[in-house]
Every structure is written in C-alpha cells, then in structure tokens.
Amino acid sequence: MADLNAIVEQLSGLTIMEAAELVKQLEEKWGVSAAAAPVMMAGGPAAAAAPVEEKTEFTVVLADAGANKINVIKEVRAITGLGLKEAKDLVEGAPKEVKAGVAKAEAEELKKKLEAAGAKVEVK
C-alpha cells in the first residue's frame, strides 16, 4: 500500500505536459487509447440530459428586413394574418417576434420563407 501512496504522490507532482507524455507512453506500452474512455463517459450523462433540454417550441424572430422590405412585409402578412399596417410596423421595428410557440419544422419553414423574401431571421 505504501508503494501506491508513493505513486500517487509522484503523479500529483507532475506538470500537465509531463502527465500528457505519461499517458502517451502508457498508451503505446499497453496498446490502448485513453481518449475512448473519457468520450464514452462524457457521452453517457449528456445523452441522458439531452431529452430534458430538447426544445419543442420555437420562436421565429425577424432580425432585419433587409433591402427588399415589400416582399418581407407580404410574407409576414401571409404568415401572421396581420393587416398591411401592422405587418409594415412589425417589419420596420425589427428585431421583432413574428411567430412564437411553433414546432421546429414549422419554424424552419417560416425562416426559409422569410429569408427567401430577403429578411434575416433567427429561430430561438
């Protein structure tokens, strides 16, 4: 047991560069890769936490109307059902929320439509 304590003390005194070199030499001597184990360990808890953090509702935000405001106003009207004045105010007041609480697929579709009209869009 005293030998193990001595090894622990010796390893604790290593610099980062020395520890990295030790790992490299042990990998070569034993024919293993130390990189595989930490990746597996890091992937396990992250995979378990991912479903909890996965968003189901997204908000489409008009970041900038771009140079072609008329087309963007038309697209905003089609998406939101707003009147001409309300859609114009929304576009000119960018950044503004266009639609909230939508599914990811719908949010991506709305983003494509608005970007095709010349707007800069964010999905949050």
From Swiss-Prot:
This protein's UniProt keywords: Ribonucleoprotein, Ribosomal protein
Superkingdom, natural source: Bacteria
Subunit note: Homodimer. Part of the ribosomal stalk of the 50S ribosomal subunit. Forms a multimeric L10(L12)X complex, where L10 forms an elongated spine to which 2 to 4 L12 dimers bind in a sequential fashion. Binds GTP-bound translation factors.
BP GO terms, sorted: translation
Family statement drawn from the similarity comment of this UniProt entry: Belongs to the bacterial ribosomal protein bL12 family.
One Pfam family named in its UniProt record: Ribosomal_L12_N
Gene Ontology molecular functions: mRNA binding; structural constituent of ribosome
InterPro entries on file: Ribosomal_bL12 (IPR000206), Ribosomal_bL12_C (IPR013823), Ribosomal_bL12_C/ClpS-like (IPR014719), Ribosomal_bL12_oligo (IPR008932), Ribosomal_bL12_oligo_N_sf (IPR036235)
SUPFAM superfamilies linked to this entry: ClpS-like, Ribosomal protein L7/12, oligomerisation (N-terminal) domain
Protein name: Large ribosomal subunit protein bL12
